[in-house]
């Protein structure tokens, strides 16, 4: 008796299921308004036993995501989308949870689709997709990790005011780009940022880099014995058979920590030949603090590292002294002067060339005398300055960069030049004598000379 109404009910439910399925597909293509909320109460009866032959009600999204459909005359916006349209839901550092007020419906839809329930047919709002289409795909927003902002806001919810303040116009927040730029700058080598860090980082009040030594050996109000031996360092340039150690004083360590070098713990440990260890930098800083020197953690060097940076002052001065000895004794000044003098044998040019050699010798002497008056502290010596503070500070800068090697090495090279000039002047004097003798012989052989008169008397 009841079969016709039951068949009619089954047919109506079947049509309802078909309509819901196609309307959901249509809604995925169109950004429409949900209109099936009134029919959700009827979907539960479809999954009953007598109607098990009905097709599954779960909607599986296709792998190829279709961009949102815009009816004519509107054109689709340039849209960059990944293969998986819902991959951003599981990404804790994605910007979608932060900039979409519809975060809870998105999460609800994900849970419904994973569970393959009939409730997955509930349409979800797509209003955020046109906004996300304007994002710059070249920006790497995942490098800025702020889980405390991106995650906690989802749990507590976003009200209207917070949603407005966290809209898409705030994507260009300077803090995000600054973090990335600072990280990139830290991985680079010696660049402009390395120099700016030293100038801008607040220096502790007891830092050595901001304090200068005075005459009494006091450093920033603390009594520091600059002549005290800090450690002994084996030489780097000596042979194994003649290895020598050089004493490093507290004053030398202070000069390495001060401008212009401002060495950090790693470079200072290399200069002092300290073995690398897990807590090597910490132990070095603690030892320096005991003698009144402060080495801030994480500081950056201010000057480029050269081969002279690895030498202690004792070895640098030793190298300059050996170089001066070789320039004094082994430089072929006489051979070079004779070779160059042979290229200028014109008698008319001898006088002017001799004047040029004398002027050059005088200039070299003045320059050497200036360098000899340099009173930069070296080792445990603290000589009193002779030159004016302006020129002395410039010479001190050069000496600190070269660890005391620069000025003695230049003086040694100028000594070799002076020896060449001396030998060249001696050669010029010999050339003058030879020319004078030649002129005399030439004048003696002519008529009217004393030699010619004697020969005529002898003939008579």
Curated annotation (Swiss-Prot):
Taxonomy of the source species: Eukaryota, Metazoa, Chordata, Craniata, Vertebrata
Related illness: Char syndrome: An autosomal dominant disorder characterized by patent ductus arteriosus (PDA), facial dysmorphism and hand anomalies.
GO biological process, any: skin development
Function: Sequence-specific DNA-binding protein that interacts with inducible viral and cellular enhancer elements to regulate transcription of selected genes. AP-2 factors bind to the consensus sequence 5'-GCCNNNGGC-3' and activate genes involved in a large spectrum of important biological functions including proper eye, face, body wall, limb and neural tube development. They also suppress a number of genes including MCAM/MUC18, C/EBP alpha and MYC. AP-2-beta appears to be required for normal face and limb development and for proper terminal differentiation and function of renal tubular epithelia.
Ranges for region Disordered: 30-139, 435-460
Entry GO terms, CC: chromatin; nucleoplasm; nucleus
Highest taxon above the source species: Eukaryota
Name of the molecule in the record: Transcription factor AP-2-beta
Biased composition (Polar residues): 35-51
Modification after translation: Sumoylated on Lys-21; which inhibits transcriptional activity.
Alphabetical keyword list: Activator, Disease variant, DNA-binding, Isopeptide bond, Nucleus, Phosphoprotein, Transcription, Transcription regulation, Ubl conjugation
Compositionally biased spans, kind Low complexity: 121-132
GO MF, any single term: cis-regulatory region sequence-specific DNA binding
Phosphoserine modified-residue sites: 258
Keyword Protein biosynthesis: no
Gene name for this UniProt entry: TFAP2B
Keyword NAD: no
Main location: nucleus
Cross-linked sites for Glycyl lysine isopeptide (Lys-Gly) (interchain with G-Cter in SUMO): 21
Subcellular location: Nucleus
Basic and acidic residues bias: start-end ranges: 451-460
Family from the record: Belongs to the AP-2 family.
Family matches, as Pfam families: TF_AP-2 (PF03299)
Complex and partners: Binds DNA as a dimer. Can form homodimers or heterodimers with other AP-2 family members. Interacts with CITED4. Interacts with UBE2I. Interacts with KCTD1; this interaction represses transcription activation. Interacts with CITED2 (via C-terminus); the interaction stimulates TFAP2B-transcriptional activity.
């Amino acid at each position: 008796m009841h079969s016709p109404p039951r068949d009619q009910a089954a047919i109506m439910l079947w049509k309802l299921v078909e309509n819901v399925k196609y309307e959901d597909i249509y809604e995925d293509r169109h950004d429409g308004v949900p209109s099936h909320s009134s029919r959700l109460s009827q979907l539960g009866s479809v999954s009953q036993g007598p109607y098990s032959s009905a097709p599954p009600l779960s909607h599986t999204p296709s792998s190829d995501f279709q961009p949102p459909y815009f009816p004519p005359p509107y054109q689709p916006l340039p849209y960059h989308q990944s293969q998986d349209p819902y991959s951003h839901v599981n990404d804790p550092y994605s910007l979608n949870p932060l900039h979409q007020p519809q975060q809870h419906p998105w999460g609800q839809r994900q849970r419904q689709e994973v569970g393959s329930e009939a409730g997955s047919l509930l349409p979800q709002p797509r209003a955020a997709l046109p906004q996300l289409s304007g994002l710059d795909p070249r920006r790497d927003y995942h490098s800025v990790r702020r889980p405390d902002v991106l995650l906690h806001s989802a749990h507590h919810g976003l009200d209207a005011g917070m949603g407005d303040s966290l809209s898409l116009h705030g994507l260009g927040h300077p803090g995000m780009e600054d973090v990335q730029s600072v990280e990139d700058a830290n991985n680079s080598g010696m660049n402009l940022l390395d120099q700016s860090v030293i100038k801008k980082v607040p220096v502790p009040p007891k830092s050595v880099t901001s304090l200068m030594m005075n005459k009494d050996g006091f450093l920033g109000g603390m009594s520091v014995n600059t002549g005290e031996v800090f450690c002994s360092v084996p030489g780097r340039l000596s042979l194994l058979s003649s290895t020598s150690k050089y004493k490093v004083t507290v004053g030398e360590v202070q000069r390495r920590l001060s401008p212009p070098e401002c060495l950090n713990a790693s470079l200072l440990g290399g200069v002092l030949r300290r073995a690398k260890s897990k807590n090597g930098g910490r132990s070095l800083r603690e030892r320096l603090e005991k003698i009144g020197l402060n080495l801030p953690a994480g500081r950056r060097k201010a000057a480029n590292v050269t081969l002279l940076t690895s030498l202690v002052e004792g070895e640098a001065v030793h190298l300059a002294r050996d170089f001066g000895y070789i320039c004094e004794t082994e430089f072929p000044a006489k051979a070079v002067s004779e070779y160059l003098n042979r290229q200028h044998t014109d008698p008319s040019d001898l006088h002017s060339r001799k004047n040029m050699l004398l002027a050059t010798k005088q200039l070299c002497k003045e320059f050497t005398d200036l360098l000899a008056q340099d009173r930069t502290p070296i080792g445990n010596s603290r000589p009193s300055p002779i030159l004016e503070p302006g020129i002395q500070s410039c010479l001190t800068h050069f000496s600190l960069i070269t660890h005391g090697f620069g000025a003695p090495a230049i003086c040694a090279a100028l000594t070799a030049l002076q020896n060449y000039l001396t030998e060249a002047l001696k050669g010029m004097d010999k050339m003058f004598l030879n020319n004078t003798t030649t002129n005399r012989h030439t004048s003696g052989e002519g008529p009217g000379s004393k030699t010619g008169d004697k020969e005529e008397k002898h003939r008579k």
